[in-house]
């Protein structure tokens, strides 16, 4: 999860992009100390910090008092706590054991200047070779579940079943899934987390396929391979992760692979259309999602699984007290959440998007709408922070540049009083505002029928650059992250008490990893990865607290099964 990289756009004055610069116009993206690495057999450190050391003021962070710290027994025994990752960000082994090239492999290798530190995820966190270590960490922390994604080009190197199924890729995920289950950890699998087979990009433009058939069919076949090979043991599926982010950044701003944007904007391939292509890709994603869910319900229903998709949702607060700013907030939420949620709830895009994007927004056929409506029995919400929404007049003086400009609302980091919405949390775009999560869950309850929800990502990143290096000891003493996680878990309890239908929480991320266009300049993990010393893992204070949380006075474990 990451916001628009405004500096890369050279549009700092643009009203919708102002919020993505800090007060000094700095750019930003989205995620027991040992002096030497452990042996290769045990590359992580589980030394423990007493609970008493994690109260009061730590490194300038005022932590919750002991009575305020959330407890596991606040939640039902079948409520899931876990951690999340994605394939491209952590696996590495980019060209090993038959894996094909992904859009991100191609992007990072051909446009390294588009990554903040010029890096790539050829090795990532080396999890392809260290997955056993990662599962041991999850087990030690008492996690109920692990959310990870399956690399499409690792399973289908050429993107299609006709191009061949890579058995080595199948076997890798089977080993991972089996090991998780042997350790009492439930796998939550994301089928697509932004890594398109490069072969499909070159064949027909990937998700820009104008026929609305080839990418939908190829994705459906990929999903079928996943269901066939893993469905007997995987009971929780997410078809797509953050489609709004993927489409807007890949084809709007161009900061994500394949790096497309309109002429005149600053991206790798400025021959696209930032006002149209995100909507084409988004439409294809929704059609592919509907086909995959239809397939699952027809042929795999006996496996008693859950299936849905995960949305990235940034909370919105009106900039001022005017009715216009309140409406700006609503339009912003329509593009942020409603763009992909309303089609699966009621079969079409939000009214405000239809009114403002007009002919740029594709239409669904009656048959497509029939498959879309109700194509989920669970949904994921990825929440990091909130922002102010300020009205922009609809007039000839304002010309949208990006698809997200169709909200006619500027997204402001600072309110009318010059203050941000909450305390800054390390990387400049995240501010502590747990109330935003509660607001979103109440929207899901009151507007969208209160579906079963999982918080599938929640976390902060610590900046670690050449100009501002983060010492290992400081990274391990991540009290801001600890405080952030505790306050959001407490807010979850409040939301559930208000009737929110929430069933689980996943911290983002299990590991420090490759953070897309930010490269390795931000550390989102609850576990530190020492990339200079054999990718040794060390638990941060946040991970140690989660271990205490998960194991202290825990109700008898009961894995969630579908109703």
From Swiss-Prot:
It is found in: Plastid, Chloroplast. Residues 322-358, 391-402, 447-450 are annotated as: Dimerization. Expressed in leaves only starting at day 6 after germination. It is an enzyme of class 3 (hydrolase). Residues 1-51 form a transit peptide. It catalyses: Hydrolysis of terminal, non-reducing beta-D-glucosyl residues with release of beta-D-glucose; DIMBOA beta-D-glucoside + H2O = DIMBOA + D-glucose; DIBOA beta-D-glucoside + H2O = DIBOA + D-glucose. Its EC number is 3.2.1.182, 3.2.1.21. InterPro entries: Glyco_hydro_1 (IPR001360), Glyco_hydro_1_AS (IPR018120), Glyco_hydro_1_N_CS (IPR033132), Glycoside_hydrolase_SF (IPR017853). One of its GO terms (cellular component) is chloroplast. Beta-glucosidase acting poorly on artificial aryl beta-glucosides. Has no activity toward the chromogenic substrate 6-bromo-2-naphthyl-beta-D-glucoside (6BNGlc). This is 4-hydroxy-7-methoxy-3-oxo-3,4-dihydro-2H-1,4-benzoxazin-2-yl glucoside beta-D-glucosidase 2, chloroplastic. It comes from Zea mays (Maize). The gene is GLU2.
């Amino acid at each position: 999860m990451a916001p628009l990289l405004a500096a890369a756009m050279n549009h700092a004055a643009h009203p919708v992009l102002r919020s993505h610069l800090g007060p000094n116009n700095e750019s930003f993206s989205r995620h027991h100390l040992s002096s030497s690495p452990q042996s290769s057999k045990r590359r992580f450190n589980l030394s423990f910090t007493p609970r008493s050391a994690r109260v009061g003021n730590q490194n300038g962070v005022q932590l919750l008092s002991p009575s305020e710290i959330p407890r596991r027994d606040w939640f039902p025994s079948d409520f899931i706590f876990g951690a999340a990752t994605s394939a491209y960000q952590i696996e590495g082994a980019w060209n090993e054991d038959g894996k094909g090239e992904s859009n991100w492999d191609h992007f990072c290798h051909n446009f390294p200047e588009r990554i903040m530190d010029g890096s790539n995820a050829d090795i990532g966190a080396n999890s392809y070779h260290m997955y056993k270590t990662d599962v041991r960490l999850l087990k030690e922390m008492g996690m109920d579940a692990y959310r990870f994604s399956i690399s499409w080009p690792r399973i289908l190197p050429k993107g299609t079943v006709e191009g061949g199924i890579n058995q080595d890729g199948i076997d890798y995920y089977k080993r991972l899934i089996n090991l998780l289950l042997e350790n009492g950890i439930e796998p939550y699998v994301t089928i697509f987390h932004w890594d398109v087979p490069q072969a499909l990009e070159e064949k027909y433009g990937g998700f820009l396929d104008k026929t609305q058939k080839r990418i939908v069919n190829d994705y459906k076949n990929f999903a079928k391979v996943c269901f066939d090979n893993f469905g007997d043991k995987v009971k929780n599926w997410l078809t797509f992760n953050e489609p709004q982010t993927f489409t807007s950044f890949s084809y709007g701003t161009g900061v994500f692979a394949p790096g497309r944007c309109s002429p005149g904007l600053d991206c790798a391939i400025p021959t696209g259309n930032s006002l149209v292509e995100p909507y084409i890709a988004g439409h294809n994603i929704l059609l592919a999602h509907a086909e995959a869910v239809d397939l699952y319900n027809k042929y795999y229903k006996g496996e008693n699984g859950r299936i849905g998709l995960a949305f990235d949702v940034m909370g919105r607060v009106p900039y001022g007290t005017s009715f216009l700013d309140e409406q700006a907030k609503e339009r912003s939420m329509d593009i942020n959440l409603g763009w992909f949620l309303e089609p699966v709830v009621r079969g079409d895009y939000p009214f405000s998007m239809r009114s403002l994007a007009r002919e740029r927004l594709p239409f669904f056929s009656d048959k497509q709408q029939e498959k879309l409506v109700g194509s989920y029995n669970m949904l994921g919400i990825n929440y990091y922070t909130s922002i102010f929404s300020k009205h922009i007049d609809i007039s000839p003086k304002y010309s949208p540049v990006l698809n997200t400009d169709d909200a006619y609302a500027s997204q402001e980091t600072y309110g009318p009083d010059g203050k941000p919405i909450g305390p800054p949390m390390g990387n400049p775009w995240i501010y502590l505002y747990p109330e935003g999560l509660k607001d979103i869950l109440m929207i899901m309850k009151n507007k969208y029928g209160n579906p079963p929800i999982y918080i599938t990502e929640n976390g902060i990143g610590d900046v670690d650059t050449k100009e501002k290096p983060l010492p290992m000891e400081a990274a391990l003493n991540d009290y801001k992250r600890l405080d952030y996680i505790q306050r959001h878990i407490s807010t979850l309890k409040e939301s559930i008490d208000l009737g929110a239908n929430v069933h689980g929480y996943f911290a983002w991320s299990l590991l420090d990893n490759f953070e897309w266009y930010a490269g390795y300049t931000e550390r989102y993990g609850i576990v530190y990865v020492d990339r200079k010393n054999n990718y040794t893992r060390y638990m941060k204070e946040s991970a140690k607290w989660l271990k205490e949380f998960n194991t202290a006075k825990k109700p008898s474990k009961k894995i969630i099964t579908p109703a």
